Regions:
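A compositional/biophysical signature of low hydrophobicity enriched in polar/charged and small residues
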Residues: 1-377
Length: 377
């Protein structure tokens, strides 16, 4: 057995790449033995899989390992674009990342030229528990940070969601699925107290020493329920569509300990298609393998009424734009009218899982001197 210090941690190491090609986004839903399943699909011995994931997590190549949730079905969520005076931008970024547990991805974006919406530099994902108002939450954040304006854009439908940076490396522009992208609804699911108990233990990030085949028995103890009941509740939640995937998330923004970067460019693509054809367009755009996210969101007049948004990453800007051109050409070839399109490039960026527990929200409001009841819809 190799020691922790000489276990390779580079995402480009052949065995690590084999593991990551599966572990980033191929373990869908809840499985009883996620590391065994990664081993089965990757063809790498389970002990080696766990040793490598532990080493990459300790070394910072992997920034977190966790069971994700389909939070769009559990909480009120949106992509929010914020307009700030330039001198307040970095301070607002720090606040959203460090002091708002309900903001997830926080990124400063820019466009190659002055375009509609290019003055909205700060983009965040925000989620609040069911029953609370995302507009009120954002208005409160705007007050705390001195924002001039903000635009809340909830996802109406989801067409693609799966990161897989290693799997996408070297992908040719135009690579797409034969079939249309599946449409995921964002209807809300209500949970019992027991289900929240299980879900809270289920979704917590793994420490390196928790990377083991009996992962869920420890989480069942944490939730205060017998293992079999924990597994049954988790599988029921999975059937109800509220469990996402078991995933290793790479550090894809900052340079790694090895000096490499997983990706350099993060692009948010916008398209405006005719009202009434959003699902048709989303199912076409969502076919493209390069996209890590694709949604129907309403950009409103601030963004020239764009309604399809997608995210792609890459190590070269020209290659990211080549992928965008391939999507544009495909939309033109099928006769899908696009009245406007744009690219917002990501700069400074931080990501953390958003808190979605109603109990945590009530505590946060109280800590800020706000009556939680006043934040309800």
């Amino acid at each position: 057995m190799t020691t922790a210090t000489d276990t390779p941690i580079a995402h480009t190491d052949p065995i690590n790449a084999q593991i990551l090609a599966i572990s980033e986004d191929r373990i869908q839903g809840f499985v009883r033995d996620p590391f065994g399943e990664i081993a089965r699909q990757s063809g790498v011995d389970p002990e080696v899989v766990m040793e490598r994931i532990r080493a990459m997590l300790r070394g910072g190549t992997i920034r977190r390992v966790r069971q994700t949730l389909m939070a769009t079905n559990l909480a009120e969520g949106a992509l929010v674009a914020w307009q700030f005076p330039n001198e307040k931008l970095d301070e607002a970024f720090d606040f959203m990342f460090q002091q708002d547990p309900f903001s997830g991805h926080v990124v400063i974006r820019s466009t190659d030229a002055a375009t509609p919406g290019s003055s909205y530099r700060l983009w965040t994902t925000v989620k609040v528990p069911q029953g609370y108002s995302i507009e009120k939450h954002c208005a409160f954040l705007a007050q705390l940070t001195g924002a001039d304006h903000f635009r809340v854009m909830p996802a109406k439908r989801i067409f693609a969601l799966g990161v897989g940076h290693v799997r996408r490396k070297g992908m040719e522009p135009g690579s797409k699925s034969e079939e249309l992208a599946q449409v995921k609804d964002t209807a809300k699911v209500e949970l019992s107290d027991l289900e929240w108990q299980v879900l809270t233990a289920l979704k917590r990030e793994l420490e390196p020493e928790e990377v083991s085949r009996d992962l869920w028995s420890k989480r069942a103890s944490e939730a205060g329920v017998p293992l079999e009941q924990f597994l049954e509740v988790a599988e029921n939640l999975n059937r109800r569509g509220v469990v996402g995937r078991f995933s290793t998330f790479l550090e894809h923004v900052k340079p790694l300990q090895t000096g490499e970067r997983v990706t350099r460019f993060n692009a948010l693509f916008h398209w405006a298609v005719p009202p009434g054809r959003e699902i048709e367009a989303g199912q076409q755009v969502g076919r493209f393998h390069i996209l890590t996210h694709c949604y129907w969101r309403e950009g409103g007049p601030e963004f020239r009424n764009v309604n399809i948004m997608a995210v792609a990453h890459g190590t070269e800007k020209e290659m990211v734009l080549a992928h965008k051109r391939a999507i544009d050409e495909h939309l033109a070839s099928i006769g899908m009218p696009v009245s406007y399109t744009n690219v917002f490039w990501g700069g400074r960026s931080e990501i953390k899982p958003s808190e979605i527990s109603p109990f945590a929200y009530q505590e946060w409001c109280a800590s800020r001197g706000v009556d939680p009841q006043s934040m309800r819809e």
